[in-house]
A protein has these predicted regions:
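Interdomain regulatory linker/hinge segments that flank or connect interaction modules
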Residues: 1-5, 103, 116, 158, ...
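Conserved active-site neighborhood of the chymotrypsin/trypsin-like protease fold
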Residues: 2-3, 22-115, 139-140, 148-149, ...
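Extracytoplasmic/secreted envelope proteins and their assembly/folding machinery
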Residues: 8-11, 15, 118, 179-186, ...
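Active-site region of chymotrypsin-like
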Residues: 19-21, 80-91, 115-172, 179, ...
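PDZ/PDZ-like groove recognition
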Residues: 31, 141, 145, 188-252, ...
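A cytosolic small-molecule/anion-sensing beta-strand core signal
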Residues: 38-39, 157-158, 239, 268
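Short, glycine-anchored, charge-dense loop/turn motifs used at functional sites
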Residues: 40-43, 157-163, 232
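Residue-level recognition of oxygen-bearing side chains
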Residues: 55, 161, 181, 223, ...
């Protein structure tokens, strides 16, 4: 048998081995995407592609359709957690670190069939922060484009371990949310139903030309108020890193920032100083 035939057979077998975990997810508006069983009673799918639904239908490999509730969402990591009745499944081991040019199999599900493709890993980079402030443990992209139905698909390493979940990058390339990032989000969503975000408690406006953010308002009782920030202060640094826009501040108020103490570089009346602030949890509602 040729190398290509061996590779083809191995990829098909791998997709078949994990098929029982792969589901199709259909929102109330009819849009369809993929997901996978994380553990008994829990399915992971792509948060943004799911849309603003409170419940969804989940289609399993045997054709069974089950109503699911949205147990929680984390837009910052693009993870949505669905709660429903599922069979017992073994824990899905996370893959070891993947390498550029290694292979992975993307496995999703349509209404009547499994959807799978073999892809190379085109990029592996360091941890990064999403546009919504989420801490993503590695930048992994695949050399394939996603369809709407394969958003939320599982990305599987050759040994059957889970690389992560496929979501769409700006050019519809498959960007992978790593299994370790998903595990962190699932733990928090299972416990709280949401992912807490850091809270500073200020209204900010850009100063211009990437030179900081000026404080236009301070909420009573907020971490900023307790630390002594005042209207008119210009925040120039955050833990020593330059603040170039209001978005720089917002993105740093991620899930892991709650109860952390940060040092802000501040200009007040032309004088520079440092102010320590212990961040709170952003109020909900």
């Amino acid at each position: 048998m040729s190398i290509l035939a061996d590779l083809s057979s191995a990829a098909s077998s791998l997709a078949a081995d994990v098929a029982h975990r792969i589901v199709a997810v259909r929102g109330a508006d009819g849009r369809q995407l993929s997901g996978f069983v994380w553990s008994r009673g829990l399915v992971v799918t792509a948060e943004e592609a799911l849309g603003g639904e409170d419940e969804a239908e989940v289609l399993f490999a045997d054709g069974k359709v089950v109503k699911a509730t949205i147990a929680g969402r984390d837009p910052s990591t693009d993870v949505a957690l669905l709660k429903l009745d599922t069979a017992e499944v073994a824990d899905w081991a996370p893959s070891p670190a993947v390498l550029p040019a290694s292979f992975a199999v993307l496995v999703g599900r349509g209404e009547s069939s499994l959807i799978a493709s073999l892809s190379s890993v085109s990029e592996v980079g360091p941890a990064w922060r999403s546009m919504r402030g989420g801490e993503i443990d590695a930048r992994i992209t695949l050399g394939v484009r996603l369809s709407a139905r394969t958003e939320g698909a599982a990305v599987v390493a050759p040994d059957g371990s889970l690389v992560g979940m496929a979501v769409t990058s700006p050019r519809r390339r498959a960007l992978v949310i790593p299994a370790s990032t998903i595990a962190r989000a699932v733990k928090t969503l299972s416990e709280k139903g949401y992912v807490p975000r850091g809270w500073l408690g200020v209204m900010l406006h850009p100063v211009g030309q990437g030179s900081g953010a000026i404080v236009l308002g301070v909420e009573d009782g907020s971490p900023a108020a307790k630390a002594g920030l005042l209207v008119g202060d210009v925040i120039t640094t955050w833990n020593g890193e330059a603040v170039e826009s209001v978005g720089n501040v917002a993105n740093r108020l991620a899930a892991g920032s709650v109860n952390s103490t940060i040092k802000l570089g501040v200009l007040r009346g032309g004088n520079a100083s440092d102010i320590s602030v212990t961040l709170g949890e952003r109020p909900r509602g």
